[in-house]
Each structure stands twice: as C-alpha cells, then as structure tokens.
Amino acid sequence: MACRKFCRVYGGQGRRKEEAVPPETKPSRVFPHGPFYTPAEDACLDSPPPETPKPSHTTPPSEAERLCHLQEILAQMYGNQDYPIEDDPSADAADDVDEDAPDDVAYPEEYAEELFLPGDATGPLIGANDHIPPPCGASPPGIRRRSRDEIGATGFTAEELDAMDREAARAISRGGKPPSTMAKLVTGMGFTIHGALTPGSEGCVFDSSHPDYPQRVIVKAGWYTSTSHEARLLRRLDHPAILPLLDLHVVSGVTCLVLPKYQADLYTYLSRRLNPLGRPQIAAVSRQLLSAVDYIHRQGIIHRDIKTENIFINTPEDICLGDFGAACFVQGSRSSPFPYGIAGTIDTNAPEVLAGDPYTTTVDIWSAGLVIFETAVHNASLFSAPRGPKRGPCDSQITRIIRQAQVHVDEFSPHPESRLTSRYRSRAAGNNRPPYTRPAWTRYYKMDIDVEYLVCKALTFDGALRPSAAELLCLPLFQQK
C-alpha cells in the first residue's frame, strides 16, 4: 500500500511545473445510540513540539527533481522500445484478487515479509498505568508526528517519494497507461493542461482549463472500472459538501472525470499551517464532513476511504468529500452487517474492517473521527504506522489501536462470530482503563472538550455501538452557545 499522501490529487505543491499543453479538438459533452462517555478529571497534556531532524552527511537529490524525473520516466516507459515493459506474473496474480482496485486499497498479501508480533503477543499488553507520560518534547508512544522540516518543497518527505516510486512501478506493471498517453487523450478533448498532479495507481490527474468552464478544473483520467464506478456514484449525489461531477468523457477505454479544482486537500492544508485551527473552524469542517457522510448513508452508499487526502478545501467553511473509487452500495438494511470486504486505507480503516468482519455504514464514522482528530491537532495522525517500506498489516494495525486507546475487554463486540473479538480480545486483557471512558491517547493532546467528546464517540471500538453521523451532529460542538 502506498503512503497515505500518495493519492493526493489536489495539492498544488506536489504537482509538476510544465508549460500548458494546447488543446487539439473540441469535446462533446456527455451530460451537462452508543456507549456513555465519561471525561476524566485530569487535564490533557500539551502536544510536544516537532522533533528536530538529524543532519544528513550526504546531499540528497532535489525532491522536485525526483518528482519530475519520476513523471518523465513514467511517460517514456511505454514509448521507449529500448525499455519494453514485461508482464509481471505477480501483478497478474494481484489482478485476480482485485482487478479494479482503487487508490490505496489495502492488500494484506503485500505485507507477507512484515514481522508479526511474536507468538506470545496474544497475552496481556502493557496496561494504562504502565504508560509513563513522555517528557516535554517527546512524542507519545507509537503515535506518528509530522515534522514541518521533513517536508520538502514538493510537499513530500523522502519516505513518501520512495513510496511513490514503488506505487508508480506497480501501476505500470498492472497495465496502466503512461501519463504521456493520458495527456494526449485529455488535450484531444479540448482541454489545456497546465500541470500534471501526482499520478495515482488507477490513473492520472491533470490541472486543466477549458473554454466551457470559467475556472480551472481537475481532469481525473482512469483506466480501471473503479473510475467509471466513481462517476456513476457521483452522478447520483447532490450535496454541497460532496465533490460534484462537472462532466464525463470516455475515450479509448479511459474514463475522464471533470471535477472542480479546490485550493488543496485537507492533508496539505493542515501540513502548511503553523498552528491548529480554532474551535469554530474545527466545528465547520466537522459539520460539513458529517453532513456529507449522513447524506451518502441515507443514499445507501458507504465511502470506505474517508481521510484527509480525500477531503478538498478552499476554506474551513468550504470543504467537500471526494474520491469515491472505493465506495460501495449498502446491501440490505443499513444497520445489518454485510461482508463487503476490505477496501480503503489501513491507517484509517475501522477495526471491524481490518479484522475481516461484516460491517455497516459506521465504518465511515470511525474514519471521519480520525479526520476530525487530525483537523484539531493538525500535526499528528492517530493510530498511523511509522513511515517507511515496512508498514504493518491489518493484524498490527488492530494491535496498535488496542494499545494506543487502551481498549477494555468489555468494549469488544459480544457477537459470538466476531473475528475481532475472538482473535484480539485477549490482547486487551492487561489494559486497566475503565470501559467507555477517555481513551489513553487523550492524555497527549490538548483539545476543546466538545471536540474531544465528538472524536471519542466517533471512535467507539464496537461498530454496533458507534453512533451515526446524524447523532453526532446533535452533540454539543454543533450547538450554538
């Protein structure tokens, strides 16, 4: 799985600077109640400052040069006869599992070489009383913190660029078209390309303009059926906080979505800030996000990949939810679990998804809770694995959630067929935090009490007890004072 930021398609920092590509022809428009939560009495500790990066003895290549070089190589790989692309049998095998995989779909088999916990890991974990709060300047145990000094001019860290290299090679091995071919298709429809944004595993994204649109637009060109699936979903949706589909073109088997261009994705927006957002701005972002989630759930749709990279923003009062490539339709009742399968991003997946259990629309509530947490803290991601090539599989992610939140054994689902309960309940045996009280991670972050309450309710461990988006919108944060 690529790093979370790889699928960022709206961030202006990471895009390649290139001259506008003139249009060739004129296009034809195809169509114009959960558990009670008890806050503890102790106050939250201030978030420690970012760590100072260690000096390097070697001068690495420019990040902008690496990004441009990567895009140029991708554009030449299929067209250069000296470097033919051979079919990768392992890629074919992956295609048999999920032929139309969207961006950042979690593939557990890719982590076969990851070191799992030892055999005695099913025993008790360290209890809440055994965790010593870190001194000032240290990071909380196991929680990733982004340092502004690690982010280069392109908006990517060195680890993220390495992940992009691997993901781009994987996309080509699965039969993806190079950016040069995709650019010709886009300009052939009358668009002028002003820049190529970070390529994704299912297609290319271009910053474009067209005489039919008064402002810049984003053209997302994808070769997998997941792009067509996303187009069908977007055509059904009409909500101010959901990314609208302006137009749709299908050329040579490639589906091109025309979307409005926002200033940045929420991940990039938060990374650029020096300080966290205020309570009114956090409430505005949270209200719009939960309103969009409530709307799609009432339409019988589960997004399954809600994260800051898939939320686009002009201002905190103007955001929208996008990237529906991993979405699916509800089967049966919204409250009845169904085995939809794993999809989305491991770091933001709900525990029941990671365990392979049937699930409901409340998996989106868990992911939305993580987004609201990042919006409030702005420089850290809860439950995220350390960066680098060795990122833990689903098993390690569940263990990380249990450890960092100090999940109590009584907070697991009582359902006898729950894999999450049968396989992982024993790992919470040593956790001493009383059930349904403030999770352990709240000790390390200072948040408005109403924001903290909202996040904790959204991150209810048992999906059956997790509140709906409509219920969360009734919490004190959204009530006028």
Curated annotation (Swiss-Prot):
Q: What Gene Ontology terms describe where this protein resides (cellular component)? A: host cell cytoplasm; host cell nucleus; viral tegument
Q: What is the effect of changing residue 147 to A?
A: Complete loss of autophosphorylation
So where does ATP get bound? Answer: 197-205, 220
PTM note says:
Phosphorylated by UL13; this phosphorylation regulates subsequent phosphorylation of UL31 and UL34 by US3. Autophosphorylated.
- Kindly state which keywords UniProt assigns to this record, in alphabetical order: ATP-binding, Host cytoplasm, Host nucleus, Host-virus interaction, Kinase, Modulation of host cell apoptosis by virus, Modulation of host chromatin by virus, Nucleotide-binding, Phosphoprotein, Serine/threonine-protein kinase, Transferase
Main localization (coarse): host cell
**Single Gene Ontology MF annotation:** protein serine kinase activity
Q: What class of enzyme is it?
A: transferase
UniProt-annotated location(s): Host cytoplasm; Host nucleus
Task: Output the InterPro entries linked to this UniProt entry.
Answer: Kinase-like_dom_sf, NEK_Ser/Thr_kinase, Prot_kinase_dom, Ser/Thr_kinase_AS
**Where in the sequence is the active site?**
305
Q: Which residues form the Protein kinase domain?
A: 191-478
Q: Tell me, which GO biological process terms does this entry list? A: negative regulation of protein import into nucleus; negative regulation of protein localization to nucleus; symbiont-mediated perturbation of host apoptosis; symbiont-mediated perturbation of host chromatin organization; symbiont-mediated suppression of cytoplasmic pattern recognition receptor signaling pathway; symbiont-mediated suppression of host cytoplasmic pattern recognition receptor signaling pathway via inhibition of RIG-I activity; symbiont-mediated suppression of host NF-kappaB cascade; symbiont-mediated suppression of host T-cell mediated immune response
Q: Where is this region: Disordered?
A: 12-63
Q: Assembly state and interactors? A: Interacts with host LAT; this interaction prevents LAT activation of TRAF6.
Summary of the function given for this chain in its UniProt record: Multifunctional serine/threonine kinase that plays a role in several processes including egress of virus particles from the nucleus, modulation of the actin cytoskeleton and inhibition of host immune response. Phosphorylates UL31 and UL34, two critical regulators of capsid budding from nucleus to endoplasmic reticulum, thereby facilitating virion egress. Modulates and redistributes host components of the nuclear envelope, including LMNA, emerin/EMD and the nuclear matrix protein MATR3. In turn, facilitates nuclear pore impairment and capsid release through impaired nuclear envelope.
Family named by the database record: Belongs to the protein kinase superfamily. Ser/Thr protein kinase family.
Supply the name of the protein: Serine/threonine-protein kinase US3
Organism of this sequence = Human herpesvirus 1 (strain 17) (HHV-1)
Lineage here is: Viruses, Duplodnaviria, Heunggongvirae, Peploviricota, Herviviricetes
